[in-house]
């Protein structure tokens, strides 16, 4: 791109969960020496997964609308925290294997059907927020959180990405509840 006279806007995975921004900054420094007339802009998305994808989708829309590189960069910097990421799990196995919870807590949590609800904080770190009993309640809580962050509690005119890891039925349950709460 730089060789062809094009500038670069690079959006990284959240620095709160990955060191990729450090590599991007090193690459930027090296490339700026070789291409001093080109512009290389880097944004820490402070996001991951579908939230990262949602931001990228919006930035692509802005590009397609003819916005300049600087305008897209400023939008990303200003609005990256407007994307809300909420995650839950019904399986505590990997929390135990990763050392986040003890084997005892994992066993008890499994028996009690505890579903941890996590989100990304303003530094892009994955933070456990709630321990909710049952999948049905955690799904309802995710959609309640969406309403909490939406304008006027039910006015949601943006896009919503729902992803899953081999849990289609759970994702469908979230989607159904979103569609009932936020008619479009």
Describe these PLM feature segments:
Residues 1-21:
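N-terminal glycine-rich phosphate/adenylate-binding segment common to multiple enzyme folds
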Residues 16-20, 24-29, 35-41, 47-57, ...:
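Mixed-charge interfacial surface used for oligomerization/domain docking
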């Amino acid at each position: 791109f730089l060789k062809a006279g094009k500038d670069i806007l690079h959006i990284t995975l959240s620095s709160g969960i990955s060191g990729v921004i450090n590599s991007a900054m090193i690459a930027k420094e090296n490339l700026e020496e070789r291409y001093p007339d080109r512009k290389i802009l880097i944004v820490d998305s402070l996001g991951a997964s579908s939230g990262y994808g949602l931001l990228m989708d919006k930035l692509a829309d802005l590009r397609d609308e003819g916005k300049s590189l600087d305008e897209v960069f400023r939008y990303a910097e200003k609005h990256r925290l407007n994307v809300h990421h909420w995650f839950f799990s019904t399986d505590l196995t990997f929390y135990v294997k990763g050392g986040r919870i003890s084997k005892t807590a994992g066993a008890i949590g499994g028996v009690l059907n505890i579903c941890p609800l996590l989100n990304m904080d303003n530094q892009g770190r994955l933070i456990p927020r709630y321990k909710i009993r049952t999948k049905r309640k955690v799904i309802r809580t995710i959609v309640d959180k969406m309403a909490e962050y939406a304008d006027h509690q039910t006015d949601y005119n943006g896009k919503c990405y729902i992803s899953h890891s081999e849990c289609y039925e759970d994702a469908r349950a979230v989607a159904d509840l979103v569609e009932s709460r936020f008619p479009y």
